[in-house]
Amino acid sequence: MLAGLQLADANEQIIVHDRNLGKLRELKKRCRVTVEPDLFRAVAKADMLIVAVRPASVRELLRSVGKVSRPVLAISLAAGIPLQILSKAFGPPIRWVRAMPSPASRSGRGLTAIASPRTLSPLDRKRVRDLFSKVGRVIEMPESKLDAFTVIYSSSHGYHALAALAGAAQEIGLDRKTALLASAHALADGILAWRDGKHSIESLLDEAATPGGIAATTMAGMETAGYGRAVRKGVEAGLRRVRANART
């Protein structure tokens, strides 16, 4: 996300804290941010606080911060940790929002889902949207939908599909470079044509896979081998994992 903000020439002063001093030095050099090794000073300087730690580390971090006596807008990027837990651990005058920015934010092509309480002011809502819109598209949704979004939106699905398709391409005779090029075109460029156009995914599938043709035969073979079921099982496993974060 820092790389995406840098790419967008964001005007905000960004102060970064991390207990790993080596990481702080690297971020200062690479992303042109102000670093603050002292957690309490970093929090004291912030009028918008972004908590970007692993879900299992959220409670430890909030305990380390202790009580904050002034109003601060706080955004949690921790997957699966609900607003209720955040507010209970680190409540008023902190105003909590949850956001899930994708790794593609580094290139300005991100997608961020935001979930906020009904009590959040329009001004705070705009501040959050404005921040994440600098690194890609922003959508708002009820918190109850955020776990499912977290499982589905990950760029890992694209990388996983690319690796699998390119691997299969190499097995039938293509060299690695050509296999990756052809597979990336099939996935990325095909999806861009859908996203930037006005055609439904169903109509594009019908167009690309004529009955009895090569594409239709390939897709049918994948389905027979359990492609759709494998995707569903993977998504279900991911959903169980993200929901387990609330219990860590």
Regions picked out by a protein language model, each given a short descriptive name:
Residues 2-8:
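Gly/Ala-rich phosphate-binding loop of Rossmann-like dinucleotide-binding domains
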Residues 14, 24, 42, 58, ...:
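Small-residue helix-packing motif on alpha-helices
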Residues 30, 85-95, 111-148, 157-198, ...:
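Internal alpha-helical scaffold of NAD(P)-dependent oxidoreductase catalytic cores
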Residues 34-39, 139-141:
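Short acidic-hydrophobic, aromatic-tinged amphipathic segments that line or gate anion-handling sites
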